Amino acid sequence: VGDAGDEYHNSPPWMGQDARTILAAFIGEATHGQVTMPLRVSIIANCQARPAECFVASAQSIENEIMSIIEVYRRSFFCLQPPGDTATRRGIFDAIMCGCVPVLFSPDQLGGVGGFPLQYQYHLPRPADLSILVPIENQSNVLGYLSAIARDKDRMRLLQAALKEAAPMLQYAHPKDHCQLGGALSAAARCEPDALDVLLRGLAEGLREGRVA
């Protein structure tokens, strides 16, 4: 992946929408999660058939190249996140942090045991606002489905705005020193609360309202 310039590298990873040139990316294994293996095989085949639109790579092939994963996600509009052994994948959070719309394939990924609302109710209270849930009838041609969404500029703006709002609340190493010192990140980051701030605030509100014992 090439260099997009100093402005791209100095901005928070969830910014830089103008640098995105890849429709979708999938980084993972076909065999991870026996129940979802057919879905993963289908996704990989769909990506391999349309290489100009989709980046696909084995997680093992780049497991020691974290920056490569970040670069791919930062250049992609959509990040394909089929469920594995659990509904919620780490890649979903990597995608959000990089401003890449998580593409989900099961309603369980939006709720229920292991889903967003239960595990991350304070950090991601409205996961549907920043993700795409692909209907089962469109999963065999997921890139065609996403291409239609990408052409809807208003919807894309809403998705990207939701990602920018949520991403700072998922990290702990928030660049507050940059904000205080007027560094390169100050204008974009605006010193939003980080993950710990959000958790403590949510717990305090729950205690006040009697929702947390």
Ranges and model annotations:
Residues 174-213:
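C-terminal alpha-helical cap of glycosyltransferases
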Residues 59-60, 107-109, 199:
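Short, solvent-exposed turn/loop segments enriched in Gly/Ser/Thr/Pro and often Arg
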Residues 1-49, 202-203, 207-211:
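Conserved active-site segments centered on acidic
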Residues 58-59, 66-67, 146, 171, ...:
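Membrane-interface amphipathic segments in extracytoplasmic regions
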Residues 35-38, 142-147, 174-176:
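Short conserved micro-motifs at the rims of enzyme active sites and ligand-binding pockets
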Residues 7-11, 64, 114-121:
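Alpha-helical scaffolding within the catalytic cores
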Residues 9-19, 38-101:
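Donor nucleotide-activated moiety binding/catalytic core segment of transferases
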